[in-house]
């Protein structure tokens, strides 16, 4: 990679760090090409990205971003996972690390907050934004459904009583 390509890559990576909701840094020593491709496809399907970058270039790209606190994590063979949704990158990375012990999560960042490996795992256990929206809609709909049942139940009971009374009068 010549200097112009490096500058372009650093600028692109800097933009990715600025736009991302969360960043996860991990060691990938020992992962096969197939496993790395699997990680990339899972992350892509979830709406995130995975990049392997030279540590020096990644450190330069982090300058001026909220995630600047994770500069110290870039030692050895590191891979960077990031996504706009704060939960996506940690969730996919942690799930993949459970299945492949060669991927070792070092830490990450969510906005200006620096996370250690346990922090990333805790973040991964939270529900995603879509899951939270679904729960909220369910919570809002439940009282309305109960109210509809409660208001229609007395009318149904009255109709049954009148129907029974009518049958009783017909039989008599």
Curated annotation (Swiss-Prot):
PROSITE patterns: RIBOSOMAL_L10 (PS01109). HAMAP family: Ribosomal_uL10. Pfam families: Ribosomal_L10 (PF00466). It comes from Brucella abortus biovar 1 (strain 9-941). Belongs to the universal ribosomal protein uL10 family. GO terms for biological process: translation. Part of the ribosomal stalk of the 50S ribosomal subunit. The N-terminus interacts with L11 and the large rRNA to form the base of the stalk. The C-terminus forms an elongated spine to which L12 dimers bind in a sequential fashion forming a multimeric L10(L12)X complex. The keyword ATP-binding does not apply. This is Large ribosomal subunit protein uL10. GO terms for molecular function: large ribosomal subunit rRNA binding; structural constituent of ribosome. Forms part of the ribosomal stalk, playing a central role in the interaction of the ribosome with GTP-bound translation factors. NCBIfam families: PRK00099.1-1 (NF000955). InterPro entries: Ribosomal_uL10 (IPR001790), Ribosomal_uL10-like_sf (IPR043141), Ribosomal_uL10_bac (IPR022973), Ribosomal_uL10_bac_type (IPR047865), Ribosomal_uL10_CS_bac (IPR002363). The gene is rplJ. Keywords: Ribonucleoprotein, Ribosomal protein, RNA-binding, rRNA-binding. One of its GO terms (cellular component) is large ribosomal subunit.
């Amino acid at each position: 990679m010549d200097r112009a390509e490096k500058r372009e890559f650093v600028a692109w990576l800097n933009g990715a760090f600025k736009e991302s909701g969360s960043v996860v840094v991990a060691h990938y020593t020992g992962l096969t090409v197939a496993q790395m491709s699997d990680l990339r496809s899972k992350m892509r399907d979830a709406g995130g990205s995975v990049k392997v970058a030279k540590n020096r270039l990644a450190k330069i790209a982090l300058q001026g971003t909220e995630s600047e606190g994770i500069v110290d994590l870039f030692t050895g063979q590191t891979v960077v996972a990031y996504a706009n949704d704060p939960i996506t990158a940690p969730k996919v990375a942690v799930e993949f690390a459970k299945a492949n012990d060669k991927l070792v999560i070092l830490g990450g960042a969510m906005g200006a907050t620096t996370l250690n490996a346990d922090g990333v795992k805790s973040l991964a256990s939270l529900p995603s934004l879509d899951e939270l929206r679904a729960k909220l809609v369910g919570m809002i709909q439940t009282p309305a459904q109960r109210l509809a049942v409660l208001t229609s139940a007395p009318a149904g009971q009255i109709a049954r009583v009148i129907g029974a009374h009518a049958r009783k009068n017909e039989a008599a």
